[in-house]
């Protein structure tokens, strides 16, 4: 749930837009977020990678910093569990980010429209406004 929340807050409108949806499907043990529309490539990359940074990289750094201090075994193991579970869940985010970083120009936009993922170049964005 925290993983998806970190995606959600990086949607345009900080996840409060009518274009942002959170899907909770208990029967399939699925929690997901979806944004119907486009966002700049950089924002999309930040949105995709924020759970990896927030729930894997930062907790790892915290463990390294507090390691010499007296921290209970329970909390150390809890943080390690969060890191491991999130690392597995963020694998798809990492792959998608590499694909977008390689294929979409820096001025482009990435998004979903009618349930399908698309990207569009900067020139296409400018021609729509005209």
PLM regions and their residue ranges:
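Small-residue-rich helix-interface/hinge motifs
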Residues: 4-38
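Metalloprotease/metallohydrolase-associated module, dominated by Zn2+-dependent proteases
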Residues: 27-122, 130
């Amino acid at each position: 749930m925290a993983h998806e929340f970190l995606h959600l807050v990086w949607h345009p409108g900080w996840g409060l837009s009518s274009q942002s949806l959170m899907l909770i499907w208990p029967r399939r043990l699925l929690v997901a977020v979806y944004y119907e529309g486009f966002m700049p490539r950089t924002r999309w990359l930040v949105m995709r990678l924020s759970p990896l940074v927030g729930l894997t990289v930062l907790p790892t750094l915290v463990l390294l910093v507090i390691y010499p201090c007296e921290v209970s075994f329970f909390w150390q193991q809890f943080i390690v569990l969060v890191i491991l579970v999130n690392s597995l869940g963020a694998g798809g985010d990492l792959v998608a980010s590499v694909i977008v970083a390689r294929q979409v120009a820096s001025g482009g936009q990435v998004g979903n429209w009618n349930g399908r993922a698309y990207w569009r170049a900067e020139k296409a964005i400018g021609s729509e406004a005209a």
